Amino acid sequence: MSGYVGRLAPSPTGALHLGNVRTFAIAWLRARSLGGKMIMRMEDLDHPRDKPGAAAQAIDDLRWLGFDWDEEFVQSERRPFYRTVLAKLDAYPCVCSRRDVESAQSAPHSGEQLFYPGTCRGRFRSWEEAAEACAPRIPCWRFRVPPDTTVSFDDAFAGHVTQDVSATLGDFPLARDPDGAGYTLAATADDLDMGVTEVVRGDDLLPATPPQILIARAIGREPPSYCHVPLVVGPDGRRLAKRHGDTRIAAFRAAGVSPEKVIGWIAYTCGLSADDYPVSLADLVGRFSLAAIPHTAVVISSLPFA
């Protein structure tokens, strides 16, 4: 086995669908084609949005499709670890809502990221004091970004990326949790702790990368490499959702669609097959090439396998 370590990181906030399974397939094939190790990490920290049974269903769907992995972790079981990581960061509690941040902006910023002007810097002595001030809302932890902080990295798929984080994002949120158990901090800390060498994920998460690189370096570690691939979208160009029809893997299973048929569609959209004929995930390992994957989103205008 090579030194490559990848990871699959489903979230139980919803059912697996063609979009996230395609991204997982690219991540899995990338690792296995390089003789690497694969980690399964259930990212179940967003409790208000978690769906009952979704975690078990995701594992079952992935195994049905032919995925396997070498280690398995559950984020909700790792809260003490996130607390230790939070203690190493220059972070402070913030009570600002999204509307507060939007109204504080003096000029628009590109993309979906909001620039935070540091309103709560030095305002509260503790999380508890901030929580009392904004009750019943919950404060968040923010990472204090030093002036003139620019992050640059070479993405295996998206190419060279540079962002002046201090000028475009400011002090970014880490977690809306007293222990720091939230996506931005937890995903970064876990990737480092689990030895992940490359993060393969959808390009909707490209904006999350500069903050995660800053977190890694703040605790004295070098971040993994990154590879952000295009999403599967509906005709409106937006990520797959209920409005685009039922693309859940569970729905295809119930309709009698074979796992090889689903993987065949993924292979075709990734440039690994000339047609969407059925094929197993394992059979794609030898032919996988990151260079074959189109640099444009996959648009679903009608449901496959109908």
Where are these regions (language model features)?
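Non-catalytic terminal extensions that flank enzyme cores
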Residues: 1-15, 33, 38, 65, ...
